[in-house]
Amino acid sequence: QAIDSLSALGVVFVASAGNNGDANFHLLYDASVSDTLKTQVKFDSYSYPQMFGQCLTLWGTPGNSFEACIQVLNSSGTLLSETPFYLTDTLDTYINDTLFAGADTVLYNVLADSANAMNQRPFMQIRVASRNTANKIILQIHADTGIVHAWNLIELNNGVGNWGSDFAAPYAGYTAGDPYYGI
């Protein structure tokens, strides 16, 4: 009953079957506090045969669009490659693409919705695969107004697996994740 009543108010629930009590897999970005959030996406090991990479799930405030992009930095923090910013209000196709960072490739796909039919919240999902552990994958989020929640979850290619991995702050001005907003 509690979940039904909160859902009716537009609350989004993200459930995980994994043990996320010590994983800083969530971020809260408040556009009134910061222009653009930057964070490092930490990856689980690729020791699972079904491992694709990470799934970044982002939910915003109803009526407030947001945009996000990913970057590839080398171990020194130098930008190697990046996607454009994708905006929830204008992305109307599924993006399936590759970033080239020297001899490495980073696979990614993006889908978005300006207003989910169930809760009117803007939504974006970015799936990213990067096997070069020396490189850093960076998520950037920007909005003019509102709040955006983000979760960093494992993505397996068999459709299951949703335990969390950390968001990290490797440099000044970056934001680390927290263990909140998981059930």
Stretches with model-predicted labels:
Residues 1-183:
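Loop-rich non-cytosolic ectodomains and luminal regions
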